[in-house]
Amino acid sequence: MITSNRKPIVPDFMRPVAELEGQVEELKKLAPKNDIIINNKIARFQNQLVKLQKEIFSSLTPLQRLHLVRQSERPTTLDYIPGILDEWIELHGDRGGADDPALVGGIGKINGRNIVFIGHQRGRGTKENVARNFGMPAPGGYRKALRLMKHANRFGMPILTFIDTPGAWAGLKAEELGQGEAIAVNLREMFSFEVPIVCTIIGEGGSGGALGIGIGDSILMLEYAIYTVATPEACAAILWKNSKESLAAAEALKITSHDLKVLGIVDEILQEPLGGAQADPYTASQYLKKELTEQLDSLSKLDSQTLKKRRYEKFRRMGAFYEI
């Protein structure tokens, strides 16, 4: 797991939990090993903590979920990979002169099955976030992903993608290098691959930047993750000319896992540990590994033509429209 000495920024709705956790930790430091009174007090505080977490996490608003998945302690692709894969190696470069650190990938084994993995990669702390461009890939990142996916298709290896980005990099240089074209080519090619593709939204799934590695046979989503055409802040600024309307925008956009399951956008919602994946990254990775294994077992029974047909029809069914 990636570690950081940086003090986490706690969202307002999580402050009561953070304060109670702090009290428990202080008591643990002060308590003698066999002090029954203090140990009983610690146990009582821990029970209160669990009750408080259940109360808060059972009623999170869409905007609160967004703030939750933006926490720096949220597990990233490279946090999950060691817990999911038995062995793995990262591969680099798009063979066109770029190696975007905001999008990582490689080959590995999950329960003895060879796979190719690809995922957005955020940083922790200012220095690492700048190096990773805050998880916003440039065109070279999507071309690197495409190279790896073509490798998987050639050698018959399933593809696992992990989505966690506020969006593709929208800088002038990205446009000069063909950001739109790079994402569009990925969409086209992912529909043509003859191997199983399982996409998992592990954090923030933002716009075309998420969709650039988001075409799959199964779309999984962690319980508190979000998936949206635009951030609530951007949507509010566009529609209401006021980013303070982001709460209303988040409600209207239907960004939560439960909303998207009802709408048929995602196939499965994966349970997270109490407190979110950041509270227990290892357990979260094991939940994810179990579901990925089941999905691969199921999809591997289908022939390539059936996979492609189902994948195409799956995305054609999304959304609603009227014919005039």
From Swiss-Prot:
It comes from the Eukaryota. GO terms for molecular function: acetyl-CoA carboxylase activity; ATP binding; carboxyl- or carbamoyltransferase activity. It catalyses: N(6)-carboxybiotinyl-L-lysyl-[protein] + acetyl-CoA = N(6)-biotinyl-L-lysyl-[protein] + malonyl-CoA. Residues 44-298 form the CoA carboxyltransferase C-terminal domain. Gene3D superfamilies: 2-enoyl-CoA Hydratase, Chain A, domain 1. PROSITE patterns: COA_CT_CTER (PS50989). It is an enzyme of class 2 (transferase). It is found in: Plastid, Chloroplast. Pathway: Lipid metabolism; malonyl-CoA biosynthesis; malonyl-CoA from acetyl-CoA: step 1/1. One of its GO terms (cellular component) is acetyl-CoA carboxylase complex. Belongs to the AccA family. Component of the acetyl coenzyme A carboxylase (ACC) complex. First, biotin carboxylase catalyzes the carboxylation of biotin on its carrier protein (BCCP) and then the CO(2) group is transferred by the carboxyltransferase to acetyl-CoA to form malonyl-CoA. Acetyl-CoA carboxylase is a heterohexamer composed of biotin carboxyl carrier protein (accB), biotin carboxylase (accC) and two subunits each of ACCase subunit alpha (accA) and ACCase subunit beta (accD). This is Acetyl-coenzyme A carboxylase carboxyl transferase subunit alpha.
